[in-house]
Amino acid sequence: MEEIIKALQNNEIIIVTDDENRENEADMICAGEKVTGEMINIMAKYARGLICTPIGKNIARQFDLEMMVKNNTDNHETAFTVSIDHVDTETGISAFERAQTIRALADNNTKASDFRRPGHVFPLIAKDRGVLVREGHTEATIDLMKIANLKEIGLCCEIMADDGHMLRGKAVVELAEKLGMKMTSVSEIKKYIKENNLDFSKNEENFLEKTNIINLPTDHG
């Protein structure tokens, strides 16, 4: 298989599936720091789900992003913060303005006051130890960003079928082949982290000094 991490570093969209006994869903995922309007448009067109922006806790603290609700009763406790738009956007909803807002999260010069609340970008806070403690697409996204030495800001979007139901199984593989997207799974990411003794909570700054490109094996070739 061609490298998942290299694809993310090359600003490509990949597909990540989760466990059949969890959500049993597939998400399109990409890095946030260089995301383009064209990439968000691809997600909106071919994935069709809610485009969200997984972030690390440090990013949430940096921009004072509070939780959307105090009492989270979501089935999987998805950690939505208040939604945002960058102040330089107009309505904030276009693919290009959403990309502008997300790139601003990765800009060291951006301040908390540079975002309007609520908005059209939906940050999700990943747990510190990632998929080792929560096997969700939020954590998978941020774990992949860390492994790839990218900023802890990504995008994920659930993939729906033409009929509006969730795309699953062989149909996900067929879509990945059609769009030329690399594919992996949450379980494969978790296995890689365990095999390489990566504990993200111990050294958030430089836990991956050893490699820039990692060959991440998958069941999909």
State where each predicted segment sits.
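Catalytic domains of riboflavin
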Residues: 1-221
